[in-house]
Regions:
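Juxtamembrane interface helix immediately N-terminal to a transmembrane segment
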Residues: 1-17
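Hydrophobic core segments of transmembrane alpha-helices in multi-pass, intramembrane catalytic enzymes
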Residues: 43-46, 221-230, 258-261, 403-412, ...
Length: 492
């Protein structure tokens, strides 16, 4: 079809709509008088008529099939950022616009009281420093039900030189600085300013998120521990001559929070060098076990007893996103979704459900590691980093929502890497997966108070992200050796 023919058709349609809008009142169509519907038709007709001018001015041939192909190609080849933003837009409408502006009260309902606050702020920091003070006084470190490794008392002992609220101010500054390092500086160094839009977007979402506010309110140090781990990973892969510093940093992180042990899997330079990898992990294991004796044998025994109590108990709260907490909630309340009979069946099989969920995580982890081994990859594997972070979130029995900011940097890295793929089916799958991952992540930015009941606990969202990352790794045939090789070329 020639553009000029299509233009005439469009012009005829537009003029017809305008004429109908003008004479509809005279022919008795609709309500008497010039109504809003007629004005709408009038505007639409004028729009079509004006648009037709462009087609009339062009005499080239218009092929619908070619046009559709161009549109679909443009959509499928859209930058990753577009699909990430689209997922965020959906969440923004569902969890902000609708509850704030479209509520039944017909008034602005500000999102307030969405953190289970404790007065005064910085309670966890004050509680932990009081334990350090107790240890220095000779009364023991674990008298106050603390569950941190012994080295924590050494690392954070300088806080005793300060008084509250100065301690809280200093910890807040450390956390914010750590967030800048882990969420902006290190990813920028790794990506060399590529996909900076996605990177900066995730940094902003992380620093303004509900989880970050929770972290600051409690005076927690998850972001600090994660930053030490991330810095260790970066040094190990990009400045290998300083690898011993990397071992020290990640060991300190483990001795502060324990769960950074998941990130030791990132300290692999050559997946097929079994001897070096075994020696490295063995050395790290021996070193970290020895650090548990830093305050003496008795403190070590107290720590072990504390861990046994912690691992044997499940603290069920909507903001405890651990696997154990989720299964307990699922099998006791049904998350407000399942009927009592179904809940009873779930409760009888709670151990099996736990096993299946842990097995599913391990399978996803094995797929990522297996592909890295098969491809003999080197460098920082962004997908593995994301999966390790999710493991650090869900495996510990006590895992509170103030750990959520840890997702921001790893998601930025995982979703910023997008190898070119011309296979249409894979492009469609990738597009859908990116939107789903973005949607799941963006839900974690809002408090459990404003999420749907069945998503109040973040665990299902983590499993969606885990599945999506694994799917991208396989479908997109992602290989991160290319990123590392590009880094070396840039350095030269």
């Amino acid at each position: 079809m020639k553009n000029i023919k299509f233009g005439h058709s469009l012009l005829g349609t537009g003029v017809s709509i305008v004429l109908f809008a003008l004479i509809s009142d005279y022919i008795g169509f609709g309500k008497p008088g010039f109504q809003a519907a007629q004005l709408l038709l009038l505007q639409f007709g004028v729009l079509l008529s004006v648009t037709s001018i462009g087609f009339l001015a062009s005499g080239s041939e218009l092929k619908v099939s070619r046009l559709i192909n161009q549109i679909t190609t443009r959509i499928f080849n859209s930058p990753t950022a577009n699909w990430v933003y689209f997922g965020f837009l959906i969440t923004y409408i569902l969890l902000f616009i609708i509850p704030v502006f479209f509520n039944s009260d017909r008034r602005i309902d500000y999102l307030t009281r969405y953190i289970p606050e404790i007065t005064p702020v910085g309670r966890d920091l004050s509680f932990a420093t009081s334990g350090i003070k107790s240890w220095l006084s000779g009364n023991g470190f674990y008298l106050k039900d603390l569950n941190y490794p012994p080295l924590y008392a050494v690392v954070f002992s300088p806080f005793l030189l300060l008084t509250y609220p100065t301690t809280f101010f200093v910890m807040t500054a450390i956390t914010l600085f750590s967030m800048v390092v882990s969420g902006l500086i290190l990813p920028s160094l790794i990506l060399k300013n590529k996909d900076s839009a996605v990177l900066f977007f995730f940094f902003l979402t992380g620093i303004f998120s509900y989880g970050m506010q929770f972290e600051l309110e409690r005076g927690q140090y998850n972001v600090f521990a994660f930053t030490l781990s991330f810095l260790a990973i970066y040094i190990f892969h990009r400045h290998y001559q300083f690898r011993h510093l990397a071992y020290l940093l990640i060991s300190v992180a483990i001795q502060i929070k324990l769960y950074p042990i998941f990130f030791t899997l990132m300290l692999v330079k050559n997946w097929r060098d079994w001897k070096s990898n075994i020696l490295r992990f063995t050395g790290l294991g021996i070193f970290n076990v020895s650090l548990l004796f830093v305050l003496g044998y008795k403190t070590f025994i107290d720590f072990i007893n504390t861990m046994l109590i912690l691992f044997g108990s499940v603290w069920t709260r909507p903001y405890n996103h651990s696997l154990a907490s989720f299964v307990r909630d699922l099998t006791s309340t049904g998350l407000g979704v399942f009927k009592p009979d179904t809940v009873s069946v779930l409760q009888e099989n709670s151990s099996l459900i736990k096993f299946i969920l842990i097995l599913y995580y391990l399978v996803c982890l094995a797929i990522i590691v297996g592909r890295a081994y098969r491809n003999n990859e080197s460098g920082i594997n962004f997908d593995l980093f994301a999966v390790c972070t999710i493991g650090a979130m869900i495996i510990p029995s006590l895992s509170i929502d103030y750990k959520l900011p840890l997702l921001s940097p790893v998601m930025a890295l995982a979703l910023s890497y997008s190898p070119k793929n011309d296979h249409k089916i894979r492009q469609i799958i990738k597009m859908i997966v990116l939107i789903v991952i973005s949607l799941a992540y963006s839900y974690t930015l809002f408090s459990f108070v404003h999420r749907p009941v069945f998503l109040a606990n973040c665990f299902p969202l983590f499993m969606i992200i885990l599945t999506g990352i694994t799917c991208l790794n396989v479908v997109d045939k992602r290989s991160f050796s290319q990123v590392e090789s590009q880094e070396h070329l840039t350095a030269q």
